[in-house]
Amino acid sequence: LSTAHRLCDGIESRGSSKSGKSEVRVWKLSNGLEDTLYKASHVNHPSNIWVRSHKENYVWLCKLWIYLCEQYGLRYKKTHMTYIKLGDALCGNTPMNIDTGINLSKFPQCMPEECKREDAITAYRSFYRAHKREFATWKNGIPEWFN
């Protein structure tokens, strides 16, 4: 979401990497969010391209992010720091220069071809069963779809 703001509304320039050893692309904002939002990252990842392609995609992801932050609160009995820092900035403001004329578009499926399906939820479930089983854990029991 921060990357969407930076790429839609920012001015691209060159800056130094964190170590100072290399030059990196940066996007500076002049709308008061420069010091609040995270730096742009993974700008060509299909999910990043998807979220900044249309306002409806951005709004959908904001709603998902808020839901995930709420789930974090239920599980760990505290508010995630990212929500404290970015909640109002991200979900109270869509990027100014984002396309507004198209409805929610098809979700990108960033996974091996053998897991891709017509439906993104089915595809990601297949991906997690096949490739992410070793690290998947749950606090409220294993979901039925995972077996």
Where do the protein language model's features map onto the residues?
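Sequence termini and other peripheral, non-core segments
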Residues: 1-44, 48-147
